Regions:
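Non-catalytic, topology-defining segments of multipass membrane proteins
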Residues: 1-174
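Alpha-helical transmembrane anchor segments
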Residues: 160-195
Length: 195
């Protein structure tokens, strides 16, 4: 019985740690630093946070450059057809996730036209983003999550958390973008559903 409780704790600790470490990477490095340039850091620290983001986000690693450009597009085009992830143009949360994924891939692969201004001063480490965002690396992360659960999960339902690990970044983004627009609040009047 002691072993069962230990394994449950390991799964719980792993899930909570992955959730918050990934959320911090997205909030601190991708959102506040990359998209909004709320503070500055030297190139060495930038690379430290690229690596931190890769470890924390794992299979859902997002290029800070692409994230920053998309987030700037979101602010510039809030609640219009050009907004890369407004719930106003999605019938449900899943269609918004799929649309956002296609927008992200389009910006990443340069199949969607993006104004140069949206790329201004964004952190850029091309080879690292290419490696960290590759399908092979994403699959290796997914396998690592599955192996962790094989070793420590004590019941079948714990494996239902594995897809959340695999899609952690998009899950965070969806929660913020769907629910903040649908049920959030504002401190001042805005002419869109941003909250």
């Amino acid at each position: 019985m002691q072993n069962c409780k230990k394994s449950n704790m390991e799964i719980l600790i792993f899930f909570i740690a992955h959730w918050y470490l990934s959320l911090f990477a997205q909030s601190f490095f991708h959102h506040r630093y990359s998209a909004h340039q709320m503070f500055s850091m030297n190139k060495f620290m930038e690379k430290v946070f690229f690596i931190y983001s890769f470890i924390a986000q794992g299979s859902s690693y997002m290029s800070p450059k692409v994230y920053g450009a998309m987030h700037r597009m979101h602010h510039a085009y809030a609640d219009t057809e050009k907004d890369p992830h407004s719930p106003k143009y999605s019938s449900n949360i899943i269609t918004m996730m799929v649309k956002t994924y296609h927008q992200f891939r389009g910006v990443q692969n340069k199949t969607i036209e993006v104004r140069d201004a949206f790329y201004k001063n964004l952190p850029d480490w091309k080879w690292f983003d290419k490696m960290a965002g590759s399908l092979v690396v994403k699959l290796l992360w997914a396998i690592a999550y599955i192996l962790f659960y094989i070793k420590f999960a004590t019941t079948w339902w714990m494996f239902l958390l594995v897809p959340v690990h695999i899609l952690m970044g998009p899950v965070h983004g969806t929660i913020v973008n769907w629910f903040a627009h649908k049920i959030g609040y504002t401190n001042h009047d805005v002419d869109n559903t941003s909250k």
